[in-house]
Amino acid sequence: MIEDISKKIAWLKKNPKMLKGIFRGIERETLRIQKNGHFSKTIHPYLIGSSLTHKWITTDFSENLLEFITPTSDNIDYLLSFLTDLHSFTASKIKNERMWPFSIPYCFNDQTNIQIAQYGKSNIGKMKTTYRIGLKNRYGDLINTISGIHYNFSLPLFFWTNWENNQNKKNNTDLISSGYLNLIRNYYRFGWIVPYLFGSSPAISSFFLKDTKKKYKFKKNKEDIFYLPWSTSLRLSDIGYSNTNILDLNIMFNDFNEYIESFQNALKTPSKKFINIGLKDEHGNFKQLNTNILQIENELYTQIRPKRKTKDGESLLEALKNRGIEYVEIRSLDVNPFSPIGINKNQILLLDLFLIWCALIDSPKIDKTDFLLTTKNWERIIYEGRKPNQKIYINNNNETKTLIEIGQIIFKDLNEIALILDSNSNNLLYQKACKETQLFLKNPELTYSAQCLNFLMTTGIKKTGLYLANKYHEKFINKNYFNLNQSVLEQEVIRSHQKKIEIEREDILSFEEYIRNK
């Protein structure tokens, strides 16, 4: 079922420095709201900077959907304090608005007048907006206001080049890409534990449901909020932020070149469904960038993605093709409403341990049968993860074990890895986080989803959301900066606006020509 990795852990205990230098990055999305909880109708504030060119603060789908982006760092405290500084600066510029603390928005009706994010009159700016118009026409606008946390993670080069299993690989690029694909396949197999532990969207507005309430036995509270008693992360369900079945695209993460080829095919292959939408409206305005299965790489919504930093003018696929996988992006984290910045240190420590474990254990190639079973496991945890004696498939013979049984096996290894990481930093942080989180297995009421549901049922989503939003706002505007200061942040605002103007001046091609050349 799960490989015994005691020998691998013993090797790491002898070579603990192999795990020194883990780099991370965090992206946090949050909706700007009015004081009454309704969506903000204002454009992205000029005083925060240009959403096109600001290094750390931008927008996602809509004008009111903020996205905070930290630089990469091997220091967790630096990352969290940097993210806090970005929130504090933003709060100081939107004094009459608040930042919504949940992944799922509060919707008082289905006509929320969502303004798609605008990035100016440059070709790249128009392209970003047109892509979002395409998302609206393909999947709807409300669904795209669901927010999350993206956690970027990379293991040290020293680990990949010295780990005993990698000694015979031909070159560093191949072995690193192969290693990350192994990690990704195992994340699909066992990553359901992340929404079990940290899922924070057990309830959803009725406007998101459409016909799905017929399929699942949802209950409803007084606010017209639908919930399932054992659910963990409806954001990750087919109700929420999921648009493409990677099985249909034949993207299996088994081989690097096959992954690139399958991804490219999805970007080039027309979709009958999207052809029916049309490329332009009657006035000649674009309704989407193209009618292919994916408009651009970002449209592939998966639980985890291989990534590489891009150079100017380079696409993600080109970067991957040219230089291999550099890190993985974890996309299955809900916003943690119990943290002002949407994520806490314990979550990061636990994710580190789990992702290292995914890199260590044996990772057989996945076929379609395997993938269907892993998908069923994710679905079970998403909809009924806290159900007593919940079962998980462990092989393609339909054999099952309880979530607790599998979870205990995983945590046994995580505790061993925690010892190694703590030995590098001379503290007990990883062990403490591991032991505290392990309690969630036998005590599902400790999970974030259970705590969220309790608040939503007793206090309501609007009242709870506004209470937390106001509490965090006061905390942000009264907090001193940690790593950044007011001057640095104000200078970045000025620089971002100047850079946006430069980009607009440098455009030569018409937008049509620009799109054709992409």
Swiss-Prot record:
GO terms for cellular component: cytosol. It comes from the Bacteria. One of its GO terms (molecular function) is metal ion binding. Keywords: ATP-binding, Glutathione biosynthesis, Ligase, Nucleotide-binding. It holds the Pfam family Glu_cys_ligase. It catalyses: L-cysteine + L-glutamate + ATP = gamma-L-glutamyl-L-cysteine + ADP + phosphate + H(+). Belongs to the glutamate--cysteine ligase type 1 family. Type 1 subfamily. PANTHER family: GLUTAMATE--CYSTEINE LIGASE. This is Glutamate--cysteine ligase. It comes from Buchnera aphidicola subsp. Acyrthosiphon pisum (strain Tuc7).
